[in-house]
């Protein structure tokens, strides 16, 4: 029996999980992969990838001023610009802490639109969703939290993160390393982490504890989870990815369930 059937015991009405290998193939799945789910902050992975395309196209640069005084695109992508979680209030000086911010990502979308004249949702559609044939995916509002997609589409995206075709391998490799090292901060739902490592929009597992991935996941594991009860992780060392979507908001149930589930998913494919 598949490890993935554990999701049937979670307190959600609907759930789906898919595992993708280094060849981009789905090697395990459970649940309706065609059902559309709100992604919440997993949206940031789609947005981050869109920003990487924009960087390669030189529509924007990491050095472009954006956000509060002294901040750049680089700071906003790495959650070090100083913004509050969901408002323009400034919580700390630029580059001194890791302050996870929806507002910061929304400022990135504004900057991209100002530089290109193209709405973020349209840029994502043209740059990422259409090339990957993600026909049931959209960003319908905030680029930080208003994405909608299916497990089938996100499996295609996970395959892209394992074997990039839209951006250069080096671009993705650079985006999924730690930027602005040794910064402490709060990982929502899991408390203060020191360091609270992040790449360019991608959360990096590093040495964080507690965490939503498994204890055996390599430090290089990257991804994101969302308040709507969703997550996507990529383990570049073992060439493996997992997409899991539910319709139960994140809470203590997820803190209790996700890490052991992800540990078993990893072990089932690497033992």
Model-derived segments and spans:
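Catalytic loop of the DD-peptidase/beta-lactamase superfamily, centered on the K-T-G motif
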Residues: 1-38, 96-97, 113-118, 122-126, ...
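Well-ordered alpha-helical scaffold segments within catalytic/enzyme domains
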Residues: 52-55, 108-114, 161
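Well-ordered alpha-helical segments within folded domains of soluble proteins
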Residues: 46-49, 103-110, 152-156
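Active-site helix/loop module of the DD-peptidase/beta-lactamase fold
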Residues: 38-42, 46, 54-91, 100-103, ...
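Residue-level detector of alpha-helical secondary structure
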Residues: 6, 49-53
């Amino acid at each position: 029996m598949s490890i993935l059937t554990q999701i049937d015991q979670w307190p959600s009405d609907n759930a789906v999980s898919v595992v993708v290998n280094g060849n981009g193939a789905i090697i395990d799945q459970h649940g309706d992969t065609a059902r559309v789910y709100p992604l919440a902050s997993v949206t940031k992975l789609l947005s981050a990838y869109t920003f990487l395309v924009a960087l390669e196209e030189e529509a924007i640069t990491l050095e472009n001023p954006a956000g509060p005084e002294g901040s750049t695109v680089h700071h906003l992508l790495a959650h070090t610009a100083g913004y509050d979680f969901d408002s323009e209030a400034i919580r700390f000086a630029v580059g001194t802490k890791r302050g996870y911010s929806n507002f910061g990502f929304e400022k990135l979308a504004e900057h991209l639109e100002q530089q290109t004249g193209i709405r973020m949702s349209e840029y994502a559609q043209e740059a990422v969703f259409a090339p990957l044939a993600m026909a049931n995916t959209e960003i319908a509002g905030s680029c930080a939290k208003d994405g909608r997609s299916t497990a089938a589409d996100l499996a295609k995206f996970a395959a892209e993160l394992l074997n990039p075709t839209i951006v250069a391998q080096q671009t993705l490799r650079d985006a999924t390393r730690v930027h602005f090292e040794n910064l402490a901060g709060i990982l929502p739902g899991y408390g203060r982490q020191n360091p609270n490592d992040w790449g360019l929009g991608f959360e990096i597992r590093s040495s964080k504890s507690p965490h939503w991935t498994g204890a055996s996941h390599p430090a290089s594991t990257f991804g994101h989870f969302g308040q709507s009860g969703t997550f996507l992780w990529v383990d570049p060392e073992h060439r493996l990815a997992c997409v899991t979507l539910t319709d139960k908001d994140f809470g203590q149930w997820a803190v209790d369930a996700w890490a052991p589930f992800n540990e078993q998913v990893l072990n089932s494919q690497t033992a």
